[in-house]
Amino acid sequence: LGDEGHEFAKVGCSRFSFANPEVFLAKQRLDQLLQVRSLCDSRQQAQRLIRAGEVLVNRQVVDKPGTEVDEAAVIEVKARSPYVSRGGEKLAKALAEFAISVTGRTCLDGGISTGGFTDCLLQSGAARVYGVDVGYGQVAWALQQDPRVVIKERTNLRYLVPADLYGEAPLADFGVVDVSFISLVKVLPAVWALLQPPREVVLLVKPQFEVGRDKVGKKGVVRAATDQAGAIAPVLQTALDLGWGYGGLTWSPLQGPAGNIEYLLWLGMNCQQPAPDFQAILQMAEQARQEISS
């Protein structure tokens, strides 16, 4: 453990300090140094870790891959996740807390990105995962090579129809969604159509993409519990209107890169828990703030 309670990845030792001018230039890009020092398998992975706030330089988080770093700097990488990205740890909490089984199921990952959610699903027993992302080239190499994973990149989830994703194959009956720069309210109708009953889904609700700009503070962080609740409530109501039942709500064990508290919302056609009203959601948001800040 580091002095601030962080756990660090070990490759022979827990910290790395290279100060030999014959080996390194006076300064190098941080993403290059991570790869050179064998802290990452690729420069692309290094960039993802840096942007996610997982890399410390001289005990300070640096989140820009192109930052020029002195050759003598101490570079630390927080302990590697059991998944290809730490997003998997977020989903793992929901699966455990809500006692959701995905064993043998065909799943949809809306917003696959690196593939943390997909990796979590596979490690939890999923038979197949269809991953969709508007981007390209982000999915971890191990998942690209996994025959259980079908990847559809450069695709906007909002406009995707079942035939274009599954062809003649059966639809997924369990989904996970983690999207950015768009409200979940806009993609939920497509998610409903892309799943077959019982249409179970776990949504990662990111308040900064659900509220108006006036509610978003510095660095894109939604701090007020009232605003966080105001982000969750419309997503839940939209889901209920589409035909989903409420299963549960919890907060993510990890904050977003800028420090946003994120929430995990479980829905399903067979879920029959009473849906929380705004006050109950607000209470959850306040509890999350207290838990994370303690």
Predicted regions span which residues?
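Conserved SAM-binding loop of SAM-dependent methyltransferases across substrates and taxa
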Residues: 114-125
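Short beta-strand element of Class I
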Residues: 127-130
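A basic, amphipathic helix-loop patch mediating RNA/tRNA/ribosome contacts
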Residues: 24-73, 106-107
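Class I SAM-dependent methyltransferase "Motif I" SAM/SAH-binding loop
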Residues: 111-113, 134
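Flexible, glycine-/basic-rich loop-and-beta segments that form/coincide
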Residues: 261, 265-294
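S-adenosyl-L-methionine
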Residues: 136-170, 174, 179-182
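Short, glycine-/aromatic-enriched active-site segment of Class I SAM-dependent methyltransferases
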Residues: 207-224
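A short glycine-rich, Lys/Arg-flanked "PGG" loop and its adjoining helix->strand segment in the class I
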Residues: 185-199
